[in-house]
Swiss-Prot record:
Keyword Ribosomal protein: no
GO cellular component: cytoplasm
Organism: Streptococcus mutans serotype c (strain ATCC 700610 / UA159)
Domain of life where this protein originates: Bacteria
Residues in coiled coil: 32-75
Protein name: Cell cycle protein GpsB
Length: 112
């Protein structure tokens, strides 16, 4: 990135050599005043953009931290959830087997 060669103060304090048929001093001064205003605008715009850039970088950093925290929270919950589903399925299978065994055992006793 190219650096700025002149500050508004440098432009304001610039002295030009005068010659017999030189430029109109008033016209040069007005032009330089316009350039100074432009430079001041550029400098303030650059500063605003730097501040916005810093703010946005901080927001991205915070968002990444929140995302990582959410991931660490979701991961254990997901594993607990999947283990509960497996446990529930296993318990259900056990209850079905017990029910069949009871029917076999107690069903025969009732008929006898």
């Amino acid at each position: 990135m190219a650096s700025i060669m002149y500050t508004p103060k440098d432009i304001f304090e610039q002295e030009f050599k005068s010659s017999m048929r030189g430029y109109d001093k008033k016209e040069v001064d007005e032009f330089l005043d316009d350039i100074i205003k432009d430079y001041e605008t550029y400098i303030s715009t650059i500063e605003e953009l730097r501040q916005e850039n810093t703010r946005l970088k901080e927001e991205v950093k915070q968002a990444k931290k929140r995302q990582e925290a959410a991931q660490t929270t979701v991961s254990p919950a997901a594993s607990v959830s999947s283990s509960r589903v497996a446990t529930t399925a296993t318990n259900f299978d056990i209850l079905k087997r017990i029910s069949r065994l009871e029917k076999e055992v107690f069903g025969k006793q009732i008929t006898e």
